[in-house]
């Protein structure tokens, strides 16, 4: 795994992780049997570091160790290195929710709220849809969405699919490009 590899297109770059070139994509081998994907143009930025897979909350990311300006060792996630974000207050969002897909077109800078909008359905949600809950007393489904810290109730429906469609419409309207919809 930690053998050094030299890419013919970039003979001056020595890589610490095994990687495969697939068109314009690099597939980099990590620990735990995982792989990170990124654009070929980012190979000079990524290859000089030793990368491993690390879980954080519900996602897995490629991380490495680097020294900061004071010489202290710190963990750096691949997506933050590629986008060039060092400030811990600035978030980088993966559009497709895959923390190991670090293609530039999958990454975007986001506020905490925008990053939250692009979250999947909560694990404990029993309706099967984001923004939809079932009222056990009436057997109806409620759709709601949070906007600027305020919960907006979108209505009550007999069918969970109708409620999910109402949530999706509101998510697109209020969350724009960061909306994570059901359909």
PLM ranges: what are they?
Residues 1-92, 97-183:
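Conserved recognition-core residues within compact binding domains
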């Amino acid at each position: 795994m930690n053998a050094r590899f030299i890419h013919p297109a970039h003979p001056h770059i020595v890589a610490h992780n095994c990687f495969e070139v697939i068109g314009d994509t690099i597939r980099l081998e990590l620990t735990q049997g995982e792989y990170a994907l990124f654009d070929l143009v980012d190979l000079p930025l990524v290859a000089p570091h030793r990368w491993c897979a690390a879980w954080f909350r519900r996602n897995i990311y490629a991380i490495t160790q680097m020294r900061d300006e004071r010489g202290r060792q710190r963990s750096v996630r691949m997506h933050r290195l590629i986008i060039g974000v060092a400030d811990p207050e600035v978030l980088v969002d993966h559009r497709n929710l895959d923390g190991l897909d670090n293609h530039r077109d999958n990454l975007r800078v986001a506020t905490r709220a925008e990053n939250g909008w692009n979250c999947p359905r909560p694990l404990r949600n029993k309706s099967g849809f984001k923004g939809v809950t079932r009222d056990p007393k009436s057997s109806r489904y409620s759709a709601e969405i949070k906007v600027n810290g305020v919960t907006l109730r979108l209505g009550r429906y007999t069918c969970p699919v109708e409620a999910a469609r109402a949530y999706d419409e509101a998510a697109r309207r209020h969350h724009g490009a960061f909306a994570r919809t059901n359909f």
